[in-house]
Amino acid sequence: ATENYSLKTKLMNIIGKYAKKNAIISSSSSGLLPTRIYSKCKNPERTMIGHPFNPVYMCPGVEVVPGKKTSKKYLNKANKFYKSISMNPIMVQKELPGYLSDRLQEALWREGLHIINEGYATTEELDRAIEDGPGMRWSLMGTFLTFHLAGGKAGMKHMLEQFGPALKLPWTKLKAPKLSKKLSSRVIAGTKKQAKGKSVTMISNIRDQYLVELQKLRKKYENKLRK
């Protein structure tokens, strides 16, 4: 079904009537709120979003988004199911429009449109800025772990202390949140958990080895793409 609340609500209501009570009902919506989609569905505790990435047969990630009435029992069941078919479920803690990846992509997309509109770069130059820069790192680690490495031995704590003030600089059309102690603590704790006890040096070495191999692979396929 298309990304339309009215249509999806009607469809899920019908599915809810005929599905077994303990069957998970999941929509692959790209950004609609599950609570609204399943507002008329029977047994809403088993409803959720399962948002995959294209091409689905190549990308293992899937965002699992609960509604306000979704139970942990069914979220755990969905988590196990996706893992059983070699998917990597990303368990979103609570519903929000656009979920996670599309919100991040949308921010990058909008910023790119501003840059193009104001004549700073072409679409090709912008794409190359990602392809030959952060995009290479992002395929191995996300923004937060990357910035954790940027902080040197002290990791994210030092990174926030040194580069946190840059949030106030006019580098983006997007308004930055206030870098409060609470936000800083959450970011530092999160990246520390991601590091799994490994030092910044260890993670940097793994990243560098990966990037060497990735560049070899990219050269092989880039020639085909750019002919």
What are these regions (language model features)?
Residues K8, Y57-M58, L108-W109, L140:
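N-terminal alpha-helical segment
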Residues I24-K94, G98, D102:
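Rossmann-fold dinucleotide-binding core
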Residues M87-Q93, E118, T123-K227:
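NAD(P)-dependent Rossmann-like dehydrogenase/reductase catalytic/cofactor-binding core
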Residues A1-I24:
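Rossmann-like NAD(P)-binding element
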Residues K83, W109, H114-T122:
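C-terminal regulatory/interaction module of P-loop NTP-utilizing enzymes
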Residues S101, Q105-E106, E111:
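Structural/interface elements that position substrates and couple domains in central-metabolism enzymes
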Residues T2-Y5, G98-Y99, H148:
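Short, small-residue-enriched loops and turns at beta-alpha junctions
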